[in-house]
Structures are given as C-alpha cells and as structure tokens.
C-alpha cells in the first residue's frame, strides 16, 4: 500500500470528503512530492497536486495517482476550480491543524464560503507505522551512519576541535550517500558533554575527555539517529561507572521494546534503573522518539506518553546522565518495533571505546 492508498483508506474510514495537504513532509509521504511549493487535495477516489511551473514536470514524475495541475496566479482560485469541475460542493475536509498557518486557514475558509467544514488531523500518527519500503530506506540511512562513525574513530586526535570531528563525520556520511546531516551534529566533549544538545563548537578535544556524538544521515528523505560516547585515552573510574549505568539502562530499554508497550512504560525501564543508582535530575529528557521523514516523529517515550507502540513503528532508546558543567554521556539506538521485540537499525559498538588505547 502506497501513501495515497493509505490516505484514501483513512478518508473512507473517517467518512471525510477529503483532505487538504500543504506540509512538505506530508506531501512527500502521501504523494511522493519533494518540491518546495505544493498543495494537494485528496478525496475518497481522486487526488490532485497543485503546483507552479517550476515543479510541474517533477510532480508529474513523482506523484503517482495524482492529477497534476499548474496554477498561474492563485492557488485558491485553482482549488475552487477543482472543486467545481469535480462537483465537490460540500462536506468535511481534514486539514493539518498543527502545520497550516492561520492566514492560510482563514483564506481557505473565505474562499470556500460556508460550503465546507474542517477538522484537524494529526497526520504524524498516520506516518508512525512504517511501510516496508520506508524501513528499507531507514536501514540504509542507519548503515551510512554506522559506517561513517567507524571511519571517524581512527581519525580522532587530541588537539582537534569538536568542529574538526564534526566535519570528518559529516564528510564520511556524505561519501556514503547521505544527502545531508539529519540535524545539527552534536559533538560535546569534556565539560560540554553535560549538555544533552551540545552542538559542535571550537572547543579543543583534550586527553581524558568524554565525547558524545549524536548524529544521523538522510537517505532519500529518511533520517537516521544514533548517539555514542567515547573517551580520549584511558577512562577514569568515574567515567567507567557512569558509562556502565547508562549502557545497562539503554540495553534494558532496547530489550523492553515490543508491540503493546506504552511510551511511559519504556521510559520507566530506563529511568528507574538510572534513578535507583542515585541519578534522578541528571536524566531529565525523554527516553525516545520516532524517526522517519522527520528527525522527531510519533511515537514518543517519556513519563507522560500513553501511546501504545505498534509493529513497524520506529523508536529511539537514548538514556543519559548529565552532571552540569562537569561530565555527561548518552547512548542511543534506533529500533523497529516488532510483535515480540525489536530490530536494531543502528549497530555501532556500545561498549566504552577508549581512543588511542
């Protein structure tokens, strides 16, 4: 089942007249469109992609099952023409309430008068369970990240900056087919490792530093996400102790992933283990999130998440400990939820790596 079939099945199940899409992520997922200007109308049995001259040919090639319509001056006028030409005169349409700007919504309402009602749909939930073709692309993205990280490790040297390491890592991903980094690459060393999202800086990497790398590749639009923490030279007893706690919590989290578990149940597996070893406030972010066409998607694993995981969802498992201004670390894998467990997407070694030893 492709994105369009999935969406039309949903429209019928929800007894909607149709949906209106403008979010580039949803246009990619449900139509295959990767241009920057598009507007899709999908009904129970028809689909239209509205775009301008720059993307008409592209949309014709990408948007299987859609009638591609080029607008000249006004998207809204073209929308009205589509409705009139196809005898769509009233009904209930789903819109992207979390994405659609207020002015666009108001224009949509004004343009269509009072003929239609609108309801907000969380399309991210529709994208949460991945199709097999998506999973294959995500396996490829994850492998790019794994291979790039393996290529980085022998190049790490005391005296280089975090940005030097970032450039090497991102270059290795690009060499292997990544379109771009999944997000601003995190390289946090020494006392900066206590910052969960410490993006790479010009800090010099020193002997004895923990270095946390949180990064990902993008392959055909799909993201990977992985975190590993290494130490420059021999690890101290404190580093070994903290690392062993986080590693065990992370392994327990991965082992707990399965269809039927909730986000807060998974979170508790990691959080309780860390708390029982004396660290509560030092682990103060969620345990995981979904990944796909966006780096942060449904589902989530945090203390408040009642989301029940389904087979073929993606979830990260990424506990950490952060001692403010001193030291920190995180270990993260992305996994595919299965009926009785999970499939690892990321395979880089998780035992503590001492660089240069």
Per-region residue spans from a language model:
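Active-site neighborhoods and metal-handling regions in enzymes and metal-associated proteins
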Residues: 1-357
């Amino acid at each position: 089942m492709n994105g369009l079939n999935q969406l039309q099945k949903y429209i019928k199940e929800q007894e909607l007249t149709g949906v209106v899409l403008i979010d580039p992520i949803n246009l990619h997922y449900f139509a295959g469109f990767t241009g920057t200007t598009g507007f899709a109308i999908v009904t129970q049995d028809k689909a239209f992609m509205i775009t301008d001259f720059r993307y008409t040919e592209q949309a014709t090639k990408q948007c299987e099952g859609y009638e591609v319509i080029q607008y000249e001056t006004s998207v809204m006028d073209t929308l009205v023409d589509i409705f009139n030409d196809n005898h769509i005169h009233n009904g209930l349409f789903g819109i992207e309430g979390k994405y659609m700007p207020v002015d666009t919504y108001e224009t949509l309402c004004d343009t269509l008068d009072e003929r239609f009602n609108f309801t907000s749909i969380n399309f991210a939930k529709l994208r949460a369970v991945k199709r097999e073709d998506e999973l294959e692309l995500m396996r490829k993205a994850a492998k790019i990240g794994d291979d790039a990280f393996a290529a980085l490790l022998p190049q790490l040297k005391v005296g280089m900056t975090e940005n030097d390491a970032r450039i090497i890592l991102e270059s290795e991903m690009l060499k292997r087919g990544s379109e771009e980094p999944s997000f601003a690459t995190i390289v946090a060393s020494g006392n900066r490792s206590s910052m969960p999202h410490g993006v790479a800086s010009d800090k010099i990497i020193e002997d004895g530093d923990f270095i946390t790398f949180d990064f990902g590749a993008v392959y055909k639009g799909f993201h990977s996400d992985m975190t590993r923490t290494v130490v420059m030279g021999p690890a101290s007893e404190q580093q070994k102790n903290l690392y062993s706690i986080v590693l065990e919590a992370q392994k327990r989290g991965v082992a707990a992933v399965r269809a039927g578990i909730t986000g807060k149940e998974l979170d508790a597996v990691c959080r309780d283990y860390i708390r029982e070893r004396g660290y509560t406030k030092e682990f103060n972010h969620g345990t995981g999130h979904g990944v796909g066409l966006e780096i942060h998607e449904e589902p989530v694993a945090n203390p408040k998440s009642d989301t029940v995981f389904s087979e073929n969802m993606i979830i990260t498992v990424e506990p950490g400990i952060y001692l403010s201004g001193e030291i920190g670390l995180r270990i993260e894998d992305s996994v595919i939820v299965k009926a009785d467990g999970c499939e690892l997407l990321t395979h880089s070694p998780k035992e503590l790596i001492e660089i240069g030893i």
